[in-house]
């Protein structure tokens, strides 16, 4: 468990989650 791997994993999760919120918000769901 290295800090870089954890940081990248967390960053990807946050990015994917925020992107999904934007998409759902624009589709009106």
From Swiss-Prot:
Topology within the bilayer: Single-pass membrane protein
Question: Taking the first listed entry, what is the main subcellular location of this protein, grouped into a coarse class?
Answer: plastid
| BP terms from Gene Ontology | cytochrome complex assembly; photosynthesis
**Would you name any one GO CC term?**
chloroplast thylakoid membrane
Q: Which InterPro entries does this entry report, sorted A to Z?
A: Cytochr_b6-f_cplx_su8_sf (IPR036143), Cytochrome_b6-f_cplx_su8 (IPR005497)
Question: What residue intervals traverse the membrane?
Answer: 3-23
> Which named protein is this?
Cytochrome b6-f complex subunit 8
What interactions and quaternary structure are annotated? The 4 large subunits of the cytochrome b6-f complex are cytochrome b6, subunit IV (17 kDa polypeptide, PetD), cytochrome f and the Rieske protein, while the 4 small subunits are PetG, PetL, PetM and PetN. The complex functions as a dimer.
* GO terms, molecular function: electron transporter, transferring electrons within cytochrome b6/f complex of photosystem II activity
Question: What subcellular locations does the record give?
Answer: Plastid, Chloroplast thylakoid membrane
Q: Tell me the function of this protein.
A: Component of the cytochrome b6-f complex, which mediates electron transfer between photosystem II (PSII) and photosystem I (PSI), cyclic electron flow around PSI, and state transitions.
Q: Which UniProt keywords apply?
A: Chloroplast, Electron transport, Membrane, Photosynthesis, Plastid, Thylakoid, Transmembrane, Transmembrane helix, Transport
- Which protein family is it in? Belongs to the PetN family.
Q: Which lineage is the organism of this entry classified under, starting from the top rank?
A: Eukaryota, Viridiplantae, Streptophyta, Embryophyta, Tracheophyta
What is the originating organism of this protein? Pinus thunbergii
Superkingdom as given in the UniProt entry: Eukaryota
> Cross-referenced Pfam families, in alphabetical order?
PetN (PF03742)
